[in-house]
C-alpha cells in the first residue's frame, strides 16, 4: 500500500463492546489521512453528554439515518451487518491489491424497522489515481418512509456545494436538521446549516488548507446523483475528537468544526438510492476525473438499479452497474450484467478492466464472461496482454480472449 496514493475504506457495524449506533458507517482514506472520519467519543470521553447525545449516534457517522430516529443501545451493542458479497477474499500478507475491490453489506435498522444495503468499491485507474463508489439503499419494511438522511463528514476548513455542472444551488440558511423535528437530539449539534431543494446531480468539494505543511492543499471531491424529492445541506458538526490525538495532523483538529454534507431523500431511498463517487486529490495532484454521469437500465423492472459513468482524463471510461438482486439482468447500450456489481471500461492505451461481482454474466463489446454459479471475475488488459482472476470456473466457450492472453 502506498501511503499517499492508495485508497482504503473502513466499514463499521455495531457488534460487541465500545460500539456506537451507526448502522453501516464508513471512513475514507486519501493522501495520507483519514479524510472521511468517524467522529470519535467526545470531549469528556464515554461519560460526557456530548458522547451520549451526538458522538455515539447516527448523525455523527458517515451513514444513513431513517426518519430522524435511527438508534439502538451503544457501548455493548448487538447490531452487526451481514456481508452479502465481496472481492477479494481476505488476502495473505504481501499480496498485491487488485484494481477493483468491493463489498456489499446488509443492515436491519431496528428503531425504524428499515432495510439498508451499502455497496462500496475502490476502482484504481492508474498508478496514482482511483476513486470510491458508494451506493446506499434504504427503506422501511412496511413503508411510510418520511425521509432518509445520508451523512458524510470530512476533514478541512472549507466546503463548497454546487450542481454537478458548477451552477449555483442557491443554498439558504435553514432550521431543519434539528431535534425540534421530533428527531434525535444529535441533529441539534449541527449548526451553520444551509439547504437547497433540488433534483440536480451535485458536486461537493472539501478542502484542507495545507499552508502549515507543504502548501499542497488536499481535496475530497464528491459527486452525487440527483433525485426527485431531495434536499442537500452543508453544515458544521462538532470537532472530530477521534483524530484530535493523532500526531502530525494538517491543522488543530480540536479547534476546527467538522465539515458536513447531508442529502435528505423524502420518502423511500431504495428505488432512489444515494449514488456517489468520491475522489481524493491535491493542488499538485489534481482530480483525474473529467466527469461523472448516470444512466438507467434499459427496459422495465429495475427501478432500484444504479448506473454510473466515470470518465477519466486519461481516456478511460468506466460504466458501473449496481443491482439489488444478482438474479436480475441489467442492459445498457449493448452491455449486459447479471450480478450485484460490475465495472466495464473501454480500451485505452492498450489497457482495459472488466469486473463481475457476485454474478454469472457480463457482456461488453468484444467480451463475454459467463459462469455457472455466482462468482467474482476480474479480467484486465495491461499493455496489450490479458490477465484474469476468478473465484469460480469461467466458461471459456463464452469468454473471448485474444491469443496473447495470460490466464
Model-derived segments and spans:
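Catalytic and substrate-binding regions of extracellular carbohydrate-active enzymes
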Residues: 1-173, 182, 268-270, 276-283, ...
